[in-house]
Swiss-Prot record:
Residues cleaved off as propeptide: 1-179, 285-299, 321-588
Record region (Disordered): 115-143, 342-382
Tyrosine amide: residues bearing it: 260, 318
Modification Glutamic acid 1-amide occurs at: 281
Name of the molecule in the record: Neuropeptide-like 1
GO biological process terms, semicolon-separated: neuropeptide signaling pathway
Originating species: Camponotus floridanus
Presence of keyword Secreted: yes
Compartment(s) where it occurs, according to its Swiss-Prot or TrEMBL record: Secreted
Residue positions where Serine amide is found in the record: 210, 227, 244
Chain segments annotated as coiled-coil in the UniProt record: none
Amino acid sequence: MQCIPKKTFMAMLRIPEVRSNLAAYLRTALMVQEVKNHDDMVHLKALSSEENEDFEICIPGGTYLELFRNPVLRSHLSAMERSYKFPGRFLSEEVDSRDLIPESEKRSLATLAKNGDLPITIQERESDNDDEEKRSASSSDNVGSLHELFDEVSYRRRTPEIYDYLTEQDPEVLEYSPDKRNVGSLARDFALPTGRRHIASVARDHGLPSGKRNVGSLARQSMLPLSGKRNVASLARYYMLPQSGKRNVAALARDSSLPYGKRYLGSLARSGSYPTRDYDEGKRSIASLARSGDWPSVAKRGRMTSGRIMARVLNRRYGRSLSDDREAPSEPLDLQQLIRQGNSEGKENEWQATPFTVSEDLDEGKAKNRSNRRIEASQTRHKRQIDFSDEYPLPVMQNNMLDYEDMMEAIADHYPNAEKRFMGQTVSQPPLRVFRRVLFSYLDVMSTVFCRTCNQVEPHLLQTEKIYHIYVCQYQQIYQPHHVKDNPNTNEPTTMYNHYVQKKCSPMSSSSTHGIITVVRENPADGSSSNYTPDASTRSLRPIFTPKTRYLQSLHGDCRHGFKRFLLLPDIDNFLRTSNSHIAPRSM
């Protein structure tokens, strides 16, 4: 018999499931009249008595199990037992096993687990020996199992603190039985061995061997196995790549870590590191091959180049450096002509190599080059002879005092060779009027110098005028201005030698000058020439000459400024041909 206080039993009757089960049980007991013990009916009739509140109601074990088979009812009953703390006891220690556990009741593990009748406690789980003894117990020992069941209930009555606390905090705890052993029930009842054990809870509680172990946490804490982050960008930033730094082509080229250094075309050309074969060395452009004679041995249409042609190329190539003379041959090297010549020597349908001796051809070409490279002094240079001859065969005039013989020689030669010498563009001859104005400007200056000496003419000045007289004659012979007509703006004739003006310095006579072109001044129409002083200005007798070239400077001012450099050199025609010189007449 299971005895419970009347107050607790009345509270349980308020539950619809208990009330319906108890009413069905009472109807069955009254109708069948099969009550084995008269005391049972006495105790059941006492339910309607309200005399004593402390009266205990005892229910047979079979009825108790039948009433509270539902797990929800059992949870309510256990909660009420913990709340009211009533001691449960058996009125009769001798309980018939047939009343408690019928023979027809199933004892499978699933049924016991579903009904919450598994005889497992926390103490028994912690003790391995007790667990083994419990598992080895005989299933037919129903009395022992019942004792263990009620011992568990009594244990929970002795230790109700945690359940009382949970009941006060959360009334829904009463809906769950603590006898359930699934993981969810154990987790809700905090019955797990050391709390919740899934990875997230362990990681939050820092229960992992070394904290959180995911890749993000390890990367943030620099706890990756190989010193920090291991992606390619991080390794490249920290120079931790396996091959000592960044391995892209640009980085290897900057660090000169390529197997053969830098391999682009410019570097190969500067270092001469082209892929060499048996015939190519250094630069491979057509101009380089033509200069060095390193044509490949294969010609057009798969034919082989004649050996004699290559020997001639070698003669042309090495003959210049083997000779003692530093002058180049007089004729340029024409490889195409040599190839055509060698092709004509062979057969028409066949290209065959002609046997030759390189040493004989080299000796022959060397002797021929020595004889051809001797250039006379009067012969001009070719374009490819710049490095093997002097820049100017004639002396450069650096002062005003010209040697008469040198000047005559330069004028007589006048560069008769028609080959190209200067890199500039060839221009046409200057007009005669331009040359005439420049010459008259110079003679005007010379006349001022004559007047300044007061009847004393220095010999070198006379010689200088003679030189320019000769140069005027040479100009007439070279350019032959046969199309020159009289200038309509002036009354000057076309002939230069008829410009005579009245001469002031009387000691100068035509017999003493011997054909020197003299410039004298006429008396003005309203007076004599006595107004002309030795220091008179010559601005009225010469035009303004304003060139942009610094080699042609006109003499401005009086003759007391001295005789500056204004000599007509042999190359004056080159200066006069330029468009930078502008001659403008000045009014008197």
